[in-house]
Amino acid sequence: MTDVMKYTWTNTVGGIELKFEDIATSNTVPFVFGELRSDYYGLEQIQLSKDDIVLDIGANVGMFSIYVKKKFGCRVIAFEPVLSNFEQFKSNILMNDLLLSDIELHNTAITDIENDEIRIGMPLDNTGGSSVFYHMNTMSVCKTETIDKYITEGCTYLKIDCEGGEYAIIPTILDKLNMFKYIGIEYHKYLSVQDPVALHNLLDSNFNGKIFYKEYGT
């Protein structure tokens, strides 16, 4: 995406001014601004400290992670599989007066398989729509990791927005869910076998904390 036109969006969420650059044709940044302002992830309802750890699976160009870092000052570990999004995330960190070292960022796809490769379909006009369930002319190849090794003492908030990948991830960490206090998740449905209600019930029956979720199609 080296030749595409970029645009910078500026908005204030929770009293914090944020700036994010993305490709001009993508609606992802204004869409996520709307999610943050509507508090889909419950960030205005909780308190986190600098000692807390937030895991961001499906970080895109960094909106959630950067807002969390600026709002709470806690440790943020973010995972974004699409290289162009990953590079834009780094630029957005600097644009928001943070250091690259302020957020631990991994160019990797979190799945149920360690050290594999996956192909991700990339819509050219929507940086937030990349998914392994899309097969397009433009594909990104990325290594995979499992999330369990990152779930350590101090992990407080798990955010998952990975375009259908949640169905592979959640069952692998049921025994570690209660290390978190909060889970923020967006459910997707790309295949007929993917059941957002069943996945939510699985989470709800194995997790004692608070789940903030966005239903598929909303």
Regions found by a protein language model. Give the residues of each.
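Phosphate/nucleotide-binding beta-alpha loop and adjacent structural elements of enzyme active sites
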Residues: M1-T218
